[in-house]
UniProtKB/Swiss-Prot annotation:
Disulfide bonds: none annotated. One of its GO terms (biological process) is DNA-templated transcription. It comes from Cereibacter sphaeroides (strain ATCC 17025 / ATH 2.4.3) (Rhodobacter sphaeroides). It comes from the Bacteria. GO terms for molecular function: DNA binding; DNA-directed RNA polymerase activity; ribonucleoside binding. Keywords: DNA-directed RNA polymerase, Nucleotidyltransferase, Transcription, Transferase. This is DNA-directed RNA polymerase subunit beta.
Amino acid sequence: MAQSYVGQKRIRRYYGKIREVLEMPNLIEVQKSSYDLFLKSGEGPKAADGEGIQGVFQSVFPIKDFNETAVLEFVKYELEKPKYDVDECQQRDMTYAAPLKVTLRLIVFDVDETTGARSVKDIKEQDVYMGDMPLMTANGTFIVNGTERVIVSQMHRSPGVFFDHDKGKTHSSGKLLFACRIIPYRGSWLDFEFDAKDIVFARIDRRRKLPVTTLLYALGMDQEGIMDAYYDTVDFKYQKNRGWVTRFFPERVRGTRPTYDLVDAATGEVILKAGEKATPRMVKKWIDDAQITELLVPFDHIVGRYVARDIINEETGEIWVEAGDELTMEYDRDGEVKGGTLKLLLDQGITDIPVLDIDNVNVGPYIRNTMAADKNMGRDTALMDIYRVMRPGEPPTVEAAAALFDTLFFDSERYDLSAVGRVKMNMRLDLGKPDTQRTLDRDDIIACIKALTELRDGKGEIDDIDHLGNRRVRSVGELMENQYRVGLLRMERAIKERMSSVEIDTIMPQDLINAKPAAAAVREFFGSSQLSQFMDQTNPLSEVTHKRRLSALGPGGLTRERAGFEVRDVHPTHYGRMCPIETPEGQNIGLINSLATFARVNKYGFIETPYRKVIEGQVTDDVVYMSATEEMRHTVAQANATLDEEGRFVSDLISSRKAGEFMLNPPDAIDLIDVSPKQLVSVAASLIPFLENDDANRALMGSNMQRQAVPLLQSDAPFVGTGIEAVVARDSGAAIMARRAGVIDQVDATRIVVRATEMLEPGEPGVDIYRLRKFKRSNQSSCINQRPLVKVGDVVHRGEVVADGPCTDMGELALGRNVVVAFMPWNGYNYEDSILISERILRDDVYTSIHIEEYEVAARDTKLGPEEITRDIPNVGEEALRNLDEAGIVYIGAEVQPGDILVGKITPKGESPMTPEEKLLRAIFGEKASDVRDTSLRLPPGAYGTIVEVRVFNRHGVDKDERALQIEREEVERLARDRDDELAILERNIYSRLKTLIMGKVAVKGPKGIKAGSEINDELLSTLSRGQWWQLALGEEADAKEVEALHEQFEAQKRALDHRFEDKVEKVRRGDDLPPGVMKMVKVFVAVKRKLQPGDKMAGRHGNKGVISKVVPIEDMPFLADGTHVDLVLNPLGVPSRMNVGQILETHMGWAARGLGIQIDEALQDYRRSGDLTPVKEAMRLAYGDETYEGAFADRDDEDLVEMASRVTKGVPIATPVFDGAKEPDVNDALRRAGFDQSGQSIVFDGRTGEQFARPVTVGVKYMLKLHHLVDDKLHARSTGPYSLVTQQPLGGKAQFGGQRLGEMEVWALEAYGAAYTLQEMLTVKSDDVAGRTKMYESIVKGEDNFEAGVPESFNVLVKEVRGLGLNMELLDADEE
């Protein structure tokens, strides 16, 4: 069987050495999976609790009224079918959305007045419409008001607990002040911080600070409890005349020199003299022997310590000392003890004192000092304090204070840590709480403060906020969920009020609900949120990149002004997650990033990247995805580490990284290895061949400029690619893929009809119709056009490309063209990166692109009467109407120029009072022209082109004009043709199945003229019409049943087809929903061909950009010895300082590819002459190398081989993947095989003189793009035009048809030259001298050449301003005194 056309698509010679273990995931998976989870959360066997829409409804419902006599519960929700499909929404400027239907249950209770018991009185269920929910298209976008938009994912700080310090900036001493912050997903922030005096404070929502013990009291703790939570207790026992006996901690004396003898309390021997060093060996011995447990310490050793518990007089209940009090001894002048807490206790006979284990080295007294500084002593006063901080100026009561404190952190409606926050908190503080507990509790707060004091004591590390384990991604689904929750909460208030105000018994759920707030929240999010962006649709790559973008801006994110260097910088954890290269230049640098190629977002919103497992130095094919936090524990080798056949490491030391540090490790220390070398860059960066030879700054420009490449008339896949071009084309949705295997039945430019040969679902019709998009306008006015690649009879497999879209060539991304370039100066025309181009580029339309502009006009109903779209326009000659049809609308195919009328429209004018004579004349002649004015839609200045499409929209009940009816007829015909084709294939399919079923069987009875019992064969069937075949009854019951089932399936599919057709036709014929006051709307699409011209911007893929300076005739361009003319001449000085050497390697490689293609072409010509295929095979083997040739071509039949060879005659495509591509020897080898000098340079001749240039020149083939910065869109010329209202100076900018600014510095320049008259003219008559410029215009029209300058308007403005200051300034004429 012959391969299909696309099955033999171009094969690239692959230079990568590393085997790909993992397919690249779908590039727009981020968008799709996130929104699917949001919309479908309620479907499936078990509804996912707390996820998506389901979760939002569960969190807001049930809603109770204020006295709890009724409750409104949520049962389930479902999305109905959308009213219009994607294309219809785009045409009609509507939002592609599905109605959301929610089932609610209202339960009404009877409350017993006396006992207060509640009993159910009534239950009602009802479906309620809750607004429209926008749906995502197959390509991951949304259609909002007819335009395609993308919701960009947002990077924000993950909820959880963070520890940090001020880097010594707050206090002049440079002391580090530590702080800790608990960030919830929603709710109040809680901060703990040290001040310069080492006292710990708490802040709620960044308000005034409170001592942290106040918060602990408010949590219901007392002084002893607080001391217990933060400090260990050590007992001191007093022995008269010997001192105190206390526990011995050998660890604490290691490496120190004690100030007193260490005496063993049990034996009384000195184990270490004062001033001697305790060596680690001694300490180890003490620990191992474990004989010395207690020490005897001098009496004054306890002074200054703090008591651990309240010590009370048991009999009277008097408190002698409280927990946290200092033990003191007070002396008089003679040194006699006269008081102090320690003396008090000893006098009372208390010799056993529990003391806090604070040594000021390992454990500091911060919490104890805070407690001493805190004036609160109990819960009530602490709560009041917190209330005063949160609600200043309101009189506090204990109940109100307690209620406020409870709602702040412990009420799940007001406070939500989210699953992520709980997981992060558990990890940081070693808690083991379930991730369903989403509020704080006492343990969390105690643990946070403990971790903070330990940081101050030098234990542990602070967190890095730029670590990707501490930043997470909020994708579409989650952003939408938050927005919808806001809408529902607004609705909840209204429902509660309504429940208490109406008679609840007689009411239905429908009457309680007003869905406007929820619908408005959704509409606002899609319409005006900072993260809902107009899709960048310049080319397929820009679409994909836009959907994979991660922004740190937006609601709840950073702002450009506040973001510092650290946030924008590349972090080690970006590896394999976010691209270090692709980010915008300018103020957003580093705030907007791109997802790396293999990265994905996990259920908690952290970015994960895949690694292969390594077990004992053996690399396996097991792939694991890891988030940044998990990766910290592993040692990861790079993808380019050399492995042997078995997958073991070759070298003894392997370059690897662990916890963000690079190091060399032996093979057995390595756990993971990268999946692929391109996993660390984004899609755009991985499209740059030889990226490893480019400087990062230029690679950044290269990846950004590929997104601005305009789709050209003819696409051309790059000779030198990276091998992922096909993936991008596939996932972007630009090219059309076959949904299932089949045979091509019909093909024309607008659709492909496929007879399916595989059934994905039973009962599915066996026909696929692919509608191609022809000359549609993209968001950036570039042209979207699809071309079929297949021919009738081709076999296609599932997932194969059947049609190319914009910027795709045989299913591969093709943003530019391969052109022959030379690096040499040429008469200064390539100064400062300018580009010199050959006229061949214009002649052959190499860089010609089509741009489509849309113009629309609406006829409204005004106060003075309706506007009218008509051909009958007052005061307009027949010449101006030449392109309009009888309805006043331009016809398709008309060539239009600036000022041409596209749609004729007249608007009623206000009646001016008329004289009786006028009235009489009007009555006689019926003159209508004077009361309407011409408001036709005209083509704006600077626009030329051809009309490619016209759409007319009418309001319901408004009569359609001829043009609208004609468009409607064409549309219905098209739908009918689709239906008929589908039906024909369906019938063919079903009848062939029926025939195989009944052939050779016996008919029991049949239509007229068929004998019972006759055998069914071809002859018998040919006498019957197809419809009569069903009437043949078979003897076998099983057979009869099968025929019956087939008949039912046929009828059902026919019915479905008719129903679909009817539905579409009805939509076409029905009027349109237009905005209020609009009766009729016409849209006109104008296409213009833009050839390349001086001033247009071009770029390569390596950040090498330039502007075209001149178009040179072909014969004047430099040429090679074989007569090949160069297409572009570039400046060689653009390479060294910019360090993007990749472009030179690409040029050489492209030159070799072209040379090999020419060799294959010559071999094919030989074959056509001689019929011998050997030279073709040899040329192919030479071009592709033995390995690729054996794998891809060796077993093809001759016809296929010739077909495939003829496809690479222009150049043999190669793939050199990033970081794993062709090296210098490979480039040299390719040039050698192509028969070129290995220097890559050629002798070049000057086209003007025919003389040889003095030195060889680097000539090669380079992939160049034409960018979306076209001179036609930037340059315009103004003679006269609009003026600013106050200053009367011309406006600025092309959009306002403004003038050229002559600023302060330009005035200085003219002054310096003494060009007085030029200057006067510039500042008066050419700008804001109103009378003067009018006179000058008149004199030019009359052909005179004199003018007079008057007073500029700006001078009058100055005079008025001075008068505003209270100084009356008057101008006197020269002759007045």
